[in-house]
Structures are given as C-alpha cells and as structure tokens.
Amino acid sequence: MYSLPSQAMRPLSLSPCLTRSSYLRFRILSSLSLPPIFHNSQTRLSFSKNYTRPHLFIRNCTSITAKPSSEFNRNRTQDAPDEKLRALRELFSRPGVNIDAYIIPSQDAHQSEFIAECYMRRAYISGFTGSAGTAVVTKDKAALWTDGRYFLQAEKQLSSSWILMRSGNHGVPTTFEWLNDVLAPGGRVGIDPFLFSSDAAEELKEAIAKKNHELVYLYDLNLVDVIWKESRPKPPNKPIRVHALKYAGLDVASKLSSLRSDLVDAGSSAIVISMLDEIAWLLNLRGSDVPHSPVMYAYLIVEMDRAKLFVDDSKVTPDVMDHLKNAGVELRPYNSILSEIKSLAAQGAQLWLDPSSVNAAIMNTYEIAIEKYLTSNNNKKSKTKMHTDTTGQSGGPAGVFRTSPIAFSKAVKNSAELEGMLNSHLRDAAALAQFWVWLEEEIHNGAKLTEVDVADKLLEFRSKQSGFLDTSFDTISGSGANGAIIHYKPEPGKCSVVDSKKLFLLDSGAQYVDGTTDITRTVHFGEPTAREKECFTRVLQGHIALDQAIFPQSTPGFVLDAFARSSLWKIGLDYRHGTGHGVGAALNVHEGPQSISFRYGNMTPLVEGMIVSNEPGYYEDHAFGIRIENLLYVKEVGTPNRFGGVSYLGFEKLTFVPIQTKLVDLSLLSAAEIDWLNNYHSQVWEKVSKSR
C-alpha cells in the first residue's frame, strides 16, 4: 500500500456551532474539494422547493434539451451493405444447415458475462460491443436486442442494416415474438447449442413452436466462426494459478466434501459444473482466460469418489497439478466433455445439472444418451423417470435439475474472504485518492484529457498497489452526455475530452490477489447547475437509505430496491438498472444468486456474509449521468426487539472513497443524512490516511 501525501488528506473537525448554510470547506481529498457538511443539531431540514410535474423520466429545464433515443435512431444515415450479414446468410442454405434464421447471443459455452475475445461473436457480427445483447439474423432482416443500460451505445454502434430492439420498453417484442412475426410458418431457427443455457433453449423452442417453427441445434459449426475465418483471435492460453488458502479461507477437500453431501441429499451420483467462477471457487484456482475475471475455461464433474477437470492441460503448471492431485482431481481434455457425459449416462449416472447455466449441448447429449441407456436395458417406458426437487420443478431423464449449490456457498463469504475484500478495498481507496488529486490538478491547470487518458491514468495508480492483477471491468469514464450511457466504454480517437463544465462519471474496479473492487463516483470540476445538484442529492439520499437499511433475515433483495429509488420517485424520476449485484471475493465482479433489483423474480434471501453493491443513479439521455456506488457486506445487527424470533440484518461498508459534497443540495438533506455523510468521510480519513 502507498501512504498518501500529507497535503492530499486532512482530518475532519465536526464543530457543533456551525449551521447547514455555513459549513467549512475542509477537504478530504484536495482533488474533489470535499467539505464536511456541518449542521446545528437543533435545526431540522425541510423540503422547500416546489416541483413541476415530471415528463416521463426527464423533467424539463432551461439548461438541458433531451431527445428520446428513438429519434436519434430514426435519423441514422444509410450505411453500405453489411458484408458480414451477406456472408452469414449465404451459409443458411448450406447442406446440413438449411435454416431461415440464426440467433447469436452474447455468451460463451459457460454463460459468462465477460468472455474471451475469440468468443465475442455477437460483437463481431453486429458491431455492438456492450456486454448484454442478442442478435437475430433472418434472410432479409437483422435485429439486436439489448437492455436500458446500452440503448445509447447501441444507437451509436449499430449500422442501418440493423434494427435496434430496446428490451423492456413498451411494445418491443421479444426475440421469439419477433421471429414468429417475421418468419413464415414452419421456419427453421438455428442456434449453437453450446451458447444457450438449457432453460433458454427450451423456452425458445416452446415459444417458436406456436408458429410451427423448428429449433435447429448446429453442434458441429458456429456460423459466425465460419465467416470470421483466420482473423478470429486464438483461444486464451495463459497459466492457471493456485488461490492461496489464506485468501480462500477453506481448502478444496472441505469444499468437495460439503458438495458431495449435497449430492447425497439430492439423490444424485455426480454434478456437472460449467460456470467458470464456481469451478475457480470450488478448486481454489484462478486463471486469466477472461478479461477482468480471474477464471479459466473449464468444465468440472464431481462424483462421489472422484472429480474430473476438463481443461487445456497446457495451462496447468506443476504447482497446479500438485494442488489438484492432492484434492483428488483428475485432468481431462476440455473438448471431451460431451463424450464424458455420454459415458456417465451409459452407466446410468443420475447427474445434477443446473438448467439455468449448463448449456443445451450438454443437456441434450445427456438426455439422448440416457434414452439409449434405458432402451439397452429393456426399459422402454413412454415416460422416463423424473426427479423432482423441493421447489416442485422436475428435471430431465434420470437427472436432477435444480440450481447449483455452489452459487450460494460461494456468495456467502467466510472471514478470510471478507478480510481480503476489506484489505484490497483500502489499497484501492489509496490509489483512487492519489488519482483524484492528480485529475483535479490537471483539469484546473487546463490540461486537455480524454476519457481514455483518465482511465489509463487510473490504471497506472492502481497497478502500483500490492497484489494488483487487472481491472475488474472496462472502466466507464464518461464526461457530460457520455455519462448517461450506463455501460459506456470510451474508445481512443472516438471519446470526449473531460469537460470541467460538465458532470464526470467514473465507474471502475480492480482485481487484486485478495479481493475485487467496484466503485462509482460522479464529480464536477466547475460549478454544477441547480438541476445537477438536485439529481445528485436525490441519488445520494437513495444510496444512504439503502446503506442504513435494517431488515429481517430471509429478506430477498428486491424488497430493498425501493429504498434506493424513493427519493427519485418523489419527483417522478427513476433509473433503468438494478440497484445492487453480488460481487465475488477475488472473483467475478458480478455474481449471483443475490441481487437488489426492481425485478421481482429473484427470491434469493440476503444472508450474512454476502457482498452487494449499492449503486442508485439517474441519467438524462444525451445530457449527463449520475451514479454513486459502494460495496457492502451483509451483517447481523442488534435490535431491541426480535419480532417472530428472527435475526435482523444490515450492511457494513467495504468502500471508503469520498463523495463530492459540492454536488449536494443541502436543503434536501435531513439532519440524519448529513450525519451519515460526515461520519462516512470521517471513516474515509481514519482508514485510508493510514493505508501503507
């Protein structure tokens, strides 16, 4: 860790004689001009502004003219014919293919959010580089679906050959609704079954069958790979490393023993694991195959008396080989997973398969092989045996279909993992403190810095911290209107210069050997408008409300989502993304099963030891974006009562980086909210100024 320059951070002094309107401009970080907010404890704040009725998500004001994104889409000029689409469509009539439409998802064979460059097929065919989206190509049309985080980015990146489908907006069809509408009845829709989860493939199959369409599994070739040809990047081949026990907190033998107990309880003889972070966590291994995520491409099958890791053995170092042997794990070639599934089925193995993550190629291979096994044993029943889990869901033939037990175990951090997360966050905070000092000095000295320049400099500061490995996602460095693109990625030669007269949003994170960070701050290097301050303050109020939430055990995350939106809702504003996601310990920056979101389907309870982000925001299209993000971990809290005999939970902060207070409209804050901000900044000074 690096100590901070003595002039960069100064202790706070809370003086009770100062009022809210008369507060000292001490600075926690000179780069942000961050004054503590003082108040007279005898005075209460009240809302004093009269608000006009909002129009949709954007309230009219004299300084901002925001156009709907659909208008920008209509005004796109016609591009030259898309040669990639032409080449792809030529393959539709190839023998053994014979399809009318082809679907290209974002995922790899493991349903990863971040994927190796060689698997970025949807980005290659469409030009849209956001992490979430699905492309559908027919013989005469091409459409791309993405969610609200990426509407503006997709508008910029898609050519006129593509139709942008804004998922979630009123009147926008789903992929299968669109296919049912544009294809003549009896069409054939092709997919690469390795790139769809079993659940997703079954849903698609059932939906298009309503118009008598057939879902065609193209096992032997991916059509995008065919046209990508030699220019397609090579698969990653970097070495795997052992994740030290002092960071993991639990050895592999203990984790496998617990998993095997789950197999016994489920009536299963083996489990197939395809999620890369689950494999890395279970085996205490880390890799470098996927950008920003310390994982390696592999499958894992755990049986009652053995385990098999399907991986490119050129990545396996002698240390890793010894580590695996000691845990009783054998190596198999990565591409032999289907043959192993067939072999286990031929023995009548009852496999545990998570249909939400295991790909359709594996699932379909298992089902076909089990049918053969039953036939060879003269068991020709019209309906094969099904196992049902505790939720009443049924699985495939002789299989146990339910959520992987590893996801929940991984989400509940042990003491060593929490310690590593806290330590890495303090080192990260020290790097950010130095970065913000540098950035404000540069801006005030008139330097012309692009959004990429800023992101690169932040990486430079972080890389000097001990244990630094990589960024945990592409840094979102957005000035002005670019900040409204929720997952904006600045590109060299195409990005903006950081404007001192506009809001600047910086969402970034890092991978350290002992932890994973994710933090967003929004700042202004000049004088913010009243509108910007109001929006920022309401986002801050939502952030504070969630941070202070106390809730009974077994509460799912969606119950808390409204805490973060309430202040925005009061004036008719909102944001189009979830409020919180799980975060891995030295693993993926986004992990499940927990979340805090307006989507009601996730009933996973928040449990002591889980980590979630707290990141409300507000975005005015083509104007500005605001987001404030800390990471929190769930802890038990003492309450004077325990209604129903249950424990109550709350949050503890992992992130300690100042929040720019000149963006705060004091008239909107309560005394308690002011206290929270002052206390938080006191903690920042106390913890980060001592970092080494």
Give residue spans per PLM region.
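Active-site neighborhoods and metal-handling regions in enzymes and metal-associated proteins
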Residues: 2-692
